[in-house]
C-alpha cells in the first residue's frame, strides 16, 4: 500500500468450506472475520476504498422472497456466523467500506 497508489481493494479471499467450517471454526473465523477486519483497517489508513465480498449465508434461508439489506440476519452455521462477524469487523474498522452479499 505504501509503495503503490491503490484506489480500490476488493476482498475476495475467504474460507469457503461451508460444511468443513463446522469442524474448523477457529480457521473460518480467522480468515472470514479477523483478516477481513484487518484489511479494512489497512485500507482506511491508506484512503483506499474497501469492497468486501460476503454471502447470503448470514441469513437463515427461510424467506420465500429475495433478501433485502435491512432483513434480519440469523446465520445457521459456522460459515455464516464467520462471514457475519467479518461484516461487523469491516464496518467497525472502516465505515466507508462496501459489502456485497452474494448467493
PLM region spans:
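SDR active-site strand-loop-helix element
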Residues: 9-13, 50-55, 60, 100-102
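Hydrophobic alpha-helical transmembrane segments of multipass integral membrane proteins
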Residues: 10, 36, 40-43
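Catalytic helix-loop patch of NAD(P)-dependent Rossmann-fold dehydrogenases
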Residues: 23, 30, 34-38, 58-100
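NAD(P)H-binding glycine-rich loop region in Rossmannoid oxidoreductase-like domains
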Residues: 1-31
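A short helix->loop->beta-strand "cap" motif at the edges of active sites that frequently abuts
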Residues: 45-49
Amino acid at each position: 500500500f505504501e509503495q503503490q497508489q491503490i484506489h480500490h481493494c476488493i476482498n475476495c479471499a475467504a474460507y469457503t468450506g461451508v460444511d468443513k467450517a463446522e469442524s474448523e471454526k477457529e480457521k473460518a473465523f480467522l480468515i472470514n472475520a479477523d483478516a477481513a477486519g484487518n484489511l479494512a483497517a489497512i485500507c482506511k489508513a491508506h484512503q483506499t476504498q474497501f469492497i468486501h465480498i460476503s454471502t447470503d449465508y448470514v441469513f437463515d434461508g427461510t424467506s420465500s422472497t429475495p433478501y433485502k439489506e435491512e432483513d434480519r440476519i440469523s446465520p445457521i452455521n459456522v460459515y455464516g456466523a464467520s462471514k457475519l462477524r467479518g461484516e461487523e469487523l469491516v464496518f467497525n474498522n472502516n465505515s466507508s467500506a462496501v459489502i456485497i452479499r452474494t448467493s
